[in-house]
Curated annotation (Swiss-Prot):
Superkingdom of source: Bacteria
Pfam families found in the cross-reference section: HbpS-like (PF03928)
Gene3D superfamilies the record matches: Haem-degrading domain (3.30.450.150)
HAMAP family: UPF0303
Organism placement in taxonomy: Bacteria, Pseudomonadati, Pseudomonadota, Alphaproteobacteria, Hyphomicrobiales
Family: Belongs to the UPF0303 family.
Annotated InterPro entries: PduO/GlcC-like, PduO/GlcC-like_sf, YBR137W-like
Protein known as: UPF0303 protein BAB1_1430
Length: 169
C-alpha cells in the first residue's frame, strides 16, 4: 500500500478516535487519574516521557519519567498550542500536512518556536462542552506518543484501546 493510502487510513482512524474518546466530564481528580495511568504505563515499559494534561487556562497534571529531557517539556508546550488552535490531534495534523520539516505551511503564520507539527497532543473533548484542553505526551516517536495517549484516554473513558489504536508503523 502506498504511503498516501496509509496516511488516509490513519487519518480516518484518528478522526474515529477523536469522535469516540469523549469525556462525560473532567475535573482535577479525573486529570490526575488519567495522568497517573499514562505515567504507570511509562514506568512499567521504561519509557522516558513528559506528560501534560491542561485545560485552556491552567495545567492540571504534569509528570516526567526517567529519561525525559528539558526538550520534552518544550515539545509539550508547542503541541498544546497546536491542539488549542485546531482542536484536533496533533498527529492527525502531521499526517494531513504531510511535511518533513515539522512546521506548518507559511500561510498559517504559526511560529515554529510556539507550534510543533508533531504527534502526541490529543484534545480533551467533554460531552456537551466541546474541546476544553489537551492531553500531551512527549519523548517517544510521534506515532507512539499518540498511541500512548489514545490508549490511556480510551481506558479512562471505558472504550476499547485495541479497537481504537493505530497499527504500528
Amino acid at each position: 500500500m502506498a504511503q498516501g493510502d496509509d496516511n488516509k487510513q490513519a487519518i480516518g482512524q484518528i478522526i474515529r478516535q477523536e469522535q469516540a474518546l469523549i469525556f462525560p466530564s473532567l475535573d482535577e481528580n479525573d486529570a490526575f487519574s488519567l495522568g497517573q495511568r499514562i505515567r504507570d504505563i511509562a514506568v512499567k515499559d521504561k519509557l522516558g516521557i513528559a506528560i501534560d494534561i491542561s485545560l485552556w487556562d491552567r495545567r492540571l497534571f504534569f509528570a516526567a519519567t526517567a529519561g525525559a529531557t528539558a526538550d520534552n517539556t518544550e515539545w509539550l508546550r508547542r503541541k498544546f498550542n497546536v491542539v488549542r488552535r485546531f482542536h484536533v490531534s496533533t498527529y492527525r495534523l502531521v499526517l494531513e500536512q504531510n511535511r518533513e520539516d515539522r512546521m506548518f505551511a507559511p500561510y498559517k503564520a504559526l511560529d515554529v518556536a510556539d507550534y510543533a507539527l508533531a504527534g502526541g497532543g490529543f484534545p480533551i473533548r467533554v460531552s456537551g462542552a466541546g474541546v476544553i484542553g489537551a492531553v500531551i505526551v512527549s519523548g517517544l516517536p510521534q506515532r507512539e506518543d499518540h498511541n500512548l495517549v489514545v490508549r490511556a484516554v480510551a481506558e479512562h473513558v471505558g472504550q476499547d484501546p485495541v479497537a481504537l489504536a493505530l497499527p504500528a508503523a
